[in-house]
């Protein structure tokens, strides 16, 4: 939905980015009569590869089983006993399988629109927070001004760039063990985790709850994880560590998805090993989508936006707020992103109410 107001009128709130954080921020801002304008991202090959298409990274996830309110399993038994007369009315279309990522994101998007959110399917390429109202420059050209801004551009998982990795994304290849590890396809199956830092060890340890065994693949001869985390992996009987190995290829077929991996030695040229696996989890870090800010906000050493107040979404510039994975390098869950989206809208509303902007 394009903005029909004068280009000279400053928007009250502009939200940059979509996903759970952006749509939650939009819903709360719209309900507060702030008339939010959302730049949900452009539909482009660049954004597809980065996982920053409209609707956010969750739109690339086939199944979501851990978002509150969308249970997997048989809801019929509960509804028959609790609300037998209303069973048909209450039964959701996603009954029995949780909800897909695109389905959840489209529902959140539509909810925001229902309350009056306006949407532009484009990227913001650069910003100027040095003057008020703030200046935002869309990729399609022109200039938008805003009294308050919420940045919800997320963080993109790092990938190896293998063609086979791309082929089997959401068919056994994932970048989030907590999101996908409990899916039925991975239960009691051998799984592979690629990486050697704390995140990789945490994901490998988490997956031992579901997998028959976990193969932790690291290209060096020692783990980069902290000593206590590394020792935990070494001592775990369900984790096998493959040192000095790099993922060369994800193996599989159209019918079954991932069936294994081919590893290549980093110390012995030409030496390869095949490992059977039903899933491959990349744990080689994330890159927050903050490059377009170009020094306008304070960032951490890892380029995440800094929240300047405890349990608030304020950034280093008053009137600019951050929500979701663009500022969170710890939890990185859809539901926590949605929570900070809500917080950012409330923070923006209160800031604006005190005659700022």
Task: Kindly label every feature range from the protein language model.
Residues 26-27, 161-164, 204-206, 228-229, ...:
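Short amphipathic alpha-helical segments
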Residues 16-17, 192-195:
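Conserved N-terminal Rossmann-fold NAD(P)-binding element of oxidoreductases
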Residues 10-11, 145-147, 188, 277, ...:
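Active-site acidic short loop of glycosyltransferases
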Residues 119-122, 127-139, 146-149, 153-179:
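Glycine/small-residue-rich loop that forms an oxyanion/phosphate-binding "nest" at active or ligand-binding sites
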Residues 3-5, 13-16, 20-115, 201-227:
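Beta1-alpha1 glycine-rich phosphate/pyrophosphate-binding loop at the start
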Residues 80, 85-87, 103-130, 136-138, ...:
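A Rossmann-like FAD-binding core segment of flavoenzymes
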Residues 2-4, 8-10, 31, 161, ...:
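FAD-site-proximal beta/loop scaffold in flavoenzymes
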Residues 19-20, 155-157, 197-199, 328:
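Residue-level detector of alpha-helix initiation sites
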């Amino acid at each position: 939905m394009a903005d029909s107001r004068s280009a000279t009128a400053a928007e009250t709130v502009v939200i940059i980015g979509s996903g759970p954080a952006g749509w939650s921020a939009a819903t709360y801002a719209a309900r507060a009569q702030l008339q939010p304008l959302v730049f949900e991202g452009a539909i482009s090959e660049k954004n597809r590869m980065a996982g920053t298409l409209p609707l956010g990274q969750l739109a690339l996830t086939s199944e979501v089983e851990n978002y509150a309110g969308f249970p997997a399993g048989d809801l019929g038994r509960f509804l028959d006993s609790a609300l037998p007369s209303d069973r048909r009315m209450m039964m959701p279309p996603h009954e029995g399988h949780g909800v897909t990522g695109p389905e959840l994101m489209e529902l959140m998007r539509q909810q925001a629109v229902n309350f009056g959110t306006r949407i532009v399917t484009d990227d913001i390429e650069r910003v100027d927070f040095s003057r008020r109202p703030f200046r935002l420059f869309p990729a399609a050209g022109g200039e938008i001004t805003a009294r308050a801004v919420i940045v919800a551009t997320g963080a993109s998982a790092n990938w190896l760039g293998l063609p086979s990795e791309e082929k089997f994304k959401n068919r056994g290849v994932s970048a989030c063990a907590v999101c996908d590890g409990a899916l039925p396809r991975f239960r009691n199956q051998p799984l592979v985790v690629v990486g050697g830092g704390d995140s990789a060890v945490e994901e490998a340890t988490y997956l031992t709850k579901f997998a028959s065994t976990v193969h932790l693949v690291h290209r060096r001869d020692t783990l980069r994880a902290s000593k206590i985390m590394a020792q935990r992996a070494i001592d775990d009987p369900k984790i096998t560590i493959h040192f000095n190995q790099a993922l060369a290829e994800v193996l599989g077929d159209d019918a079954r998805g991932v069936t294994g991996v081919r590893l290549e030695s980093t110390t012995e040229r030409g030496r390869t090993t095949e490992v059977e696996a039903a899933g491959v989890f990349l744990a080689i870090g994330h890159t927050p989508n903050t490059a377009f800010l170009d020094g306008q906000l304070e960032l951490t050493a890892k380029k995440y936006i800094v929240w300047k107040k405890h349990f608030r979404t304020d950034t280093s510039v008053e009137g600019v707020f951050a929500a979701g994975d663009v500022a969170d390098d710890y939890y990185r869950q859809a539901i926590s992103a949605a929570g900070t989206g809500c917080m950012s809208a409330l923070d923006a509303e209160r800031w604006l109410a005190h005659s700022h902007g």
